[in-house]
Swiss-Prot record:
The keyword DNA damage does not apply. Keywords: Hydrolase, Lipid metabolism. It comes from Helicobacter pylori (strain ATCC 700392 / 26695) (Campylobacter pylori). This is Acyl-CoA thioesterase YbgC. Its EC number is 3.1.2.-.
Amino acid sequence: MRCRVYYEDTDSEGVVYHANYLKYCERARSEFFFKQNVLPENEEGVFVIRSIKADFFTPASLGQVLEIRTQIKELRKVFVVLFQEIYCIQNASLEPMKPFKVFASEIKFGFVNRSTYSPIAIPKLFKELLNAI
């Protein structure tokens, strides 16, 4: 998924506020499901974040175009671990440039029952979709 950096994404120094990288990653994950005409939840359960490891490399800034890349690191019965990277692929000036990594994260999600929040098996449909990433 690609997105552009807007004023609302930046801090007083004009660079992307650190928490927004996690928002970009979440949007990419959600967009993946939406493109399949599926919500990332069902009547029984929902994905919840268990843990996040984040690395910040070079700050992105206003007007740049970012590309969020997602890979499956591990898929088990009740959890999935995704590796997501964000690259700057275009500057605001639109001049050609070599892409560079700005952020990387490893995020572990559990699938839990909506009422009890206890772990339950990831539904077959979601596993099939995740394996297609």
